[in-house]
């Protein structure tokens, strides 16, 4: 078993460049966490705002398939560059939209372009880092994400109380910065697509991979829960009488906890078989969100954030490394694209269904979160032939 210091030293320089660029991009994720609040402020209903967030999820779904294919075909770096510059342009266009149809269309396009990089980034980490160091590498990758996430929403919350336009400008600017970093400092990564490969071959291989299918189903369940953070959780905080900055600080608490504790937790979880750790994390996430319905004070809301964040810290680095482990090298980008597709479906299903239920029976949202958390844990622990 390698020590934590050994694992850190084993990571190559390009991996650290990827982590740094990811931090910059994640810090600038200003708009999507506040999209529900922005749209309701300019006059749209909660249901309409939830549908717009679902459109972002549809774009995410398109990006999951296209991003995985592009990562294997044109290289990891080129896919990241395309994603960053394209998303900056679409985000600036979205900032100027006021009619509902253009907002939904541009949100979908922004979702596709801004999420196109994810399969490529995960695949590039898998290319650069050997299996024995991947859990640590993905832990640091998530640390970069959550360092940005700790500072970004808190900054965005204060900006949003003055001008939502600043959120769009900041989001686009950080994407452009990461685009240039990727263009000049990242390696191409593997190109594993071959012209002789039959159409849909990677999908057929994945469909016969029972452990991978169980993992995909569990991922879909828990991501439907996770995406309540930017939709019904925001509405619940506002319904409890708190301003946007309180929601921003609660979201940033998630990132700060991960920054402080996840790498230490990762060094513990990597000692065990991945499936029980993923199941435990998914269960804690479901329970944490389920308790939100009972939380109407800031301390109680903070407690729920701590519980589901603990679940995220236990499961997420292990889950990503597990997906890379299951993926054959020649299909790595597309396997990870399928994982991202489950995240996309969770975003498509979660916010619209959650906001619709919230308007009619808020308690049903939090009960469903608990049930989905239990289901996802059970899928990960299911015996496989």
Region roles according to the model:
Residues 107-145:
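Cytoplasmic helix-loop-helix junction between adjacent transmembrane helices
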Residues 30, 57-65, 149-150, 255-259, ...:
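Residue-level signature of mid-helix packing/kink "hotspots" within the transmembrane helices
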Residues 63-75, 261-274, 358:
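Helix-to-loop junctions at the C-terminal end of transmembrane segments
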Residues 95-106, 293-304:
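Helix-loop junctions at membrane interfaces in 12-TM secondary transporters
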Residues 8-57, 213-218, 222-250:
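Helix-loop boundary and gating motifs at the non-cytosolic
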Residues 78-92, 276-290:
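Structural signature of the two symmetry-related core transmembrane helices
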């Amino acid at each position: 078993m390698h020590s934590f210091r050994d694992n850190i030293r084993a990571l190559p320089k390009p991996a650290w460049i990827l982590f740094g660029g990811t931090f910059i991009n994640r810090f600038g994720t200003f708009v999507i966490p506040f999209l529900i609040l922005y749209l309701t402020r300019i006059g749209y209903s909660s249901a309409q705002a939830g549908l717009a967030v679902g459109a972002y999820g549809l774009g995410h779904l398109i990006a999951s398939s296209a991003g995985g294919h592009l990562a294997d075909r044109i290289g990891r770096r080129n896919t990241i560059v395309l994603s960053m510059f394209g998303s900056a342009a679409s985000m600036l266009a979205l900032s100027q939209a006021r009619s509902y149809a253009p907002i939904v269309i541009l949100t979908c396009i922004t979702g596709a372009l801004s999420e196109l990089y994810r399969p490529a980034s995960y695949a590039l980490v898998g290319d650069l880092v050997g299996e024995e160091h991947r859990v640590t590498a993905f832990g640091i990758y998530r640390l970069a994400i959550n360092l940005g996430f700790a500072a970004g929403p808190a900054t965005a919350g204060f900006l949003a109380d003055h001008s939502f336009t600043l959120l769009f400008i900041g989001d686009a600017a950080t994407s452009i910065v990461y685009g240039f970093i990727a263009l000049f400092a990242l390696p191409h990564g593997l190109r594993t697509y071959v012209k002789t490969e039959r159409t849909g071959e990677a999908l057929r291989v994945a469909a016969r991979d029972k452990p991978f299918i169980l993992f995909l189903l569990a991922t879909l369940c828990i991501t439907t829960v996770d995406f309540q953070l930017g939709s019904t959780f925001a509405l619940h905080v506002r319904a409890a009488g708190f301003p946007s900055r309180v929601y921003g600080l609660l979201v940033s608490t998630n990132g700060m906890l991960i920054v402080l504790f996840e790498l230490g937790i990762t060094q513990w979880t990597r000692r065990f078989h991945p499936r029980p750790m993923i199941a435990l994390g998914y269960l804690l996430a479901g329970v944490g969100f389920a308790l939100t319905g009972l939380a109407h004070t800031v301390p109680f809301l903070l407690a729920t954030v701590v519980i589901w964040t603990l679940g995220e810290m236990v499961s997420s680095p292990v889950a990503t490394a597990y997906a890379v482990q299951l993926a054959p090298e020649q299909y790595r980008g597309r396997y990870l694209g399928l994982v991202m597709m489950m995240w996309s479906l969770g975003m498509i299903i979660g916010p619209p269904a959650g906001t619709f239920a919230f308007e009619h029976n808020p308690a049903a949202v939090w009960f469903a979160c608990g049930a989905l958390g239990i289901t996802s844990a059970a899928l990960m622990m299911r015996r496989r032939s």
